[in-house]
Amino acid sequence: MIKNIAVLEGDGIGPEVMKEAIKVLDIISKKSKIKFNYSKALVGASAINKKGNPFPDDTKDICKSSDAILFGAIGDPKYDNDPKAKIRPEDGLLEMRKFLGLYANIRPVKTYNSLIEYSPLKNKILKNVDFVVFRELTGGIYFGKKGISDDGNKAYDTCVYKKSEIERISFLAFNEALKRNKKL
């Protein structure tokens, strides 16, 4: 079985992390019947610097034709310190989510009793923690309109969700809750 992997190293520590992740996949490949073909593509600040776009069309094509995306990191201090930047590395991640319909951020939170003593938090708070957080990623504050009124007296940052966006993340969360004794 051959799987095509889009490798989006991104920025900062991304290239270093992706190099090591590919080593892990190569070990898996040697010990299994799965083979991986890697296609590198630009995203974030590296894409802005080379193509003028944080999620260029050729990256979209590679992502769309891949079985999976291996994503490094995104962001660059050059853009963090420029509040007037018209285009930002993070825009590439947001555009990728929208383009590929990656709408769910699923974060399991679990403590292991054998590790509780190493935490700075109280044992009674940590014991038996086991829940999952679901967050919708293609609507809301990330994609809302931002601005300042013409007279400069008001600022706005809208948070809008479509009914369909709320329904699909809710459906996903409710189905997971059914598998977890109705606990998320």
At which residue positions do the language-model features occur?
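Anion-binding alpha/beta catalytic cores of soluble intermediary-metabolism enzymes, centered on
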Residues: 1-12, 30, 35-37, 45-184
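Short N-terminal binding/cap micro-motifs at the start of the first secondary-structure element
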Residues: 13-18
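Short, function-defining helix-loop hinge/capping sites that tune catalysis or transport
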Residues: 19-22, 75
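Short catalytic helix/loop segments, enriched in acidic residues and glycine
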Residues: 22-32
